[in-house]
Amino acid sequence: VSETAVLDLAITRADFADPADAAALVLVLDAYACDPMGGGEPLSADVRERLAPALAQVPGAFAFLARLGGEPVGLATCFMGFSTFAARPLVGIHDVSVIPGQRGKGIARALFAAIEDEARERGACKVTLEVLSGNHRAKELYASLGYGDFQLDPEAGTALFWQKRLT
């Protein structure tokens, strides 16, 4: 397990089978879900129960937990993908969250450093993420880390993230 310590901050790769890591994952993700940028609704009891075991079954899923003084304060959930244009793997960041009250302390930056190190170790050509257009604080952070809109040709515009919920 790789660990980075900065002022009692530890970033570790989550073990989905470890009860402490599973509980930390649910705690931080639930705080994110309750935030307006996460939808403003807590995770259902069913999701809370199934989350870690389900992630353990997804090939290429990995997560990093941030703990400050041993307490969970941040999370990044990622999935391996593939870039057809580069014919190489990529890492897609699905969730990045820091507990309210702990933001602005460099926790997200430390999570991104761990993600990018992991991506390089896995031979990824890039790291991708989605962000709500109104999440200005996150967008400022991501831009400061070198992330930006995806576009192939300025005349074609930037990529959009669309979804269709299946029932």
Predicted feature locations:
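A short helix-loop-beta-strand connector motif used in the catalytic cores of GNAT acetyltransferases and
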Residues: P53-L65, G92
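C-terminal "cap" of GNAT-fold acetyltransferases
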Residues: E3-A10, F16-A17, C125-T167
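Conserved GNAT-fold acetyl-CoA-binding loop/helix
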Residues: F16-P19, A23-P53
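Conserved GNAT acetyl-CoA-binding A-motif
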Residues: F112, A119-E130
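Residue-level recognition of the GNAT/N-acetyltransferase active site
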Residues: H94, I99, L132
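Conserved acetyl-CoA-binding loop-helix of GNAT-fold acetyltransferases
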Residues: V98, G104-D117, E140-S144
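Conserved beta-hairpin
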Residues: A61-A76
